[in-house]
Amino acid sequence: MEKVSVETLIKDLNLEVIVKAENNKIDITTSDVNRPGLQFAGFYEHFAYERVQIMGKVETTFVEQLPDEVLAERADKFFAYPIPCLIVTRDLNIRQEIIEAAKKHDRYLLRTKEASTKFINRLINYLDEKLAPQITIHGNLVDVYGIGVLLLGESGIGKSETALELVKRGHRLVADDAVEIRKIGEDKLQGSAPEIIRHFIEIRGIGILDVKTLYGVGSVRNSMSIDLVIQLEEWDEDKYYDRLGLEDEYIKFLDVEVPKLTIPVRPGRNLAIIVEVAAMNHRQKQMGYNAAHELNKKLLKQIGN
């Protein structure tokens, strides 16, 4: 199971630490959040204590009206649950009873200056990305005309050389050799490079190249959705290759299907141009036009006449 430490959350979202948990640290395992207004009112049935707890203006206003003894009792019960942390938004005041209860039970108590809705949206997006299922595969990922193209194939087939030629033609490199794939939401895949090799590319006979330094910041990007997979393979005279584009092929990563094309490689074929055209044709299909289907309709119509 993927998880995020509260320390990482504090650093990445620039949160103010009011109380720091020293020995009772609980990792975050879900991107869902809970607003504990009902809990401070004394209702604990179906309490989602495993979620990040968020107190906004409504919850804080309610808490401000509670007598000291009542709040102390309810805060003590609230922090007795194994919550990862409690975050107060809008830089609102935090009553001493809540601070003391957080210290007693060794829980994180944090604060942000952001408004509740804005912060919750940012928090959920952040946790969705951090907690997303992930795999690492051998391949190259390039942003071609806004389409994330994942190049697959055996070592030495020409993936890196094709990616470099695409960069030279104005497209952007995302990852070379190793691509980390995360599942974002129900049906979206996002790819990136491991941080240690980000923006580097290996070309046999030359070695390691820093694409960002050679071609500028506009030649790279940190992550990209995976919209199209292109499998490069040695040309096999005995194998049938689709010449019309009527048959759709897919490949599955993390239970998400992605359109796939198989492109045979042999001397004289300009793979970079073929990948460019494949990306443009994919975008055209997304916009509702399929050239192969249109030609097939015209042929059937002519045969019918």
From Swiss-Prot:
Superkingdom of origin: Bacteria
What does this gene product do? Catalyzes the ATP- as well as the pyrophosphate-dependent phosphorylation of a specific serine residue in HPr, a phosphocarrier protein of the phosphoenolpyruvate-dependent sugar phosphotransferase system (PTS). HprK/P also catalyzes the pyrophosphate-producing, inorganic phosphate-dependent dephosphorylation (phosphorolysis) of seryl-phosphorylated HPr (P-Ser-HPr).
Q: What is this protein called?
A: HPr kinase/phosphorylase
Question: Where does this protein come from, organism-wise?
Answer: Caldanaerobacter subterraneus subsp. tengcongensis (strain DSM 15242 / JCM 11007 / NBRC 100824 / MB4) (Thermoanaerobacter tengcongensis)
Q: How does it assemble?
A: Homohexamer.
As its record notes, the protein acts as a catalyst of: [HPr protein]-L-serine + ATP = [HPr protein]-O-phospho-L-serine + ADP + H(+); [HPr protein]-O-phospho-L-serine + phosphate + H(+) = [HPr protein]-L-serine + diphosphate
HAMAP family registered for this protein in UniProt: HPr_kinase
Write the gene name: hprK
Q: Where is this region: Important for the catalytic mechanism of both phosphorylation and dephosphorylation?
A: 201-210
| Swiss-Prot/TrEMBL GO biological process terms | regulation of carbohydrate metabolic process
Per UniProt, what is one Pfam family of this protein? Hpr_kinase_N
